[in-house]
């Protein structure tokens, strides 16, 4: 009953290109929303105003969020996991990580990914190939985050070993 109300609120917030998975099983007395996007805090606050269940947040990355959903630990998991071989987001991961799990996929957000560099880009960083240079150091995301998966896939496609990238192991 309140599960459909929750889905209606999620549908109101959707419309662009972000994936949210909601189990179709009956939601009991709590809803746990998993992911690292700030929009999820807004969603949790909105749901707390509109449904009888308690809405909680879990701040796991995309991969770990889908795993938590498969383990039955969360009701909603967001993902932005790029699949390099198909050049697509999320669906390949969802189908392989949630076998036999009924989910509803909603697209909530679209965002741009890129490198943050010092003002003026003094080192002229333009591509992943530049990350191999000795004068360039990165700050990485934790394993399982959507950004980390994207970086890992882009490095793989460029034939760059992670050991060649200064800072790769530092999160």
Where are these regions (language model features)?
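Short secondary-structure boundary segments
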Residues: 81-82, 142
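Flexible hinge/capping segments at coil-to-helix
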Residues: 108, 117-137
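N-terminal hydrophobic or amphipathic helices and topogenic motifs
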Residues: 1-64, 70-73, 81, 92, ...
């Amino acid at each position: 009953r309140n599960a459909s109300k929750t889905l209606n609120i999620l549908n109101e917030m959707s419309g662009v290109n972000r994936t949210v998975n909601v189990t179709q099983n009956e939601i009991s007395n709590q809803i746990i929303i998993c992911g690292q996007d700030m929009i999820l805090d807004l969603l949790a606050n909105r749901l707390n105003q509109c449904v009888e269940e308690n809405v909680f947040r879990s701040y796991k990355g995309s991969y770990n969020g889908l795993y938590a959903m498969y383990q039955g630990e969360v009701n909603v998991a967001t993902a932005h996991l790029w699949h390099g071989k198909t050049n697509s987001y999320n669906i390949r991961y969802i189908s392989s990580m949630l076998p036999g799990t009924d989910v509803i996929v909603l697209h909530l957000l679209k965002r741009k990914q890129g490198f943050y560099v010092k003002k003026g880009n003094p080192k002229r960083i333009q591509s992943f190939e530049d990350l191999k240079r000795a004068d360039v150091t990165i700050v990485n995301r934790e394993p399982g985050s959507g950004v980390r998966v994207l970086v890992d896939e882009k490095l793989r496609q460029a034939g760059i070993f992670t050991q060649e990238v200064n800072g790769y192991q530092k999160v």
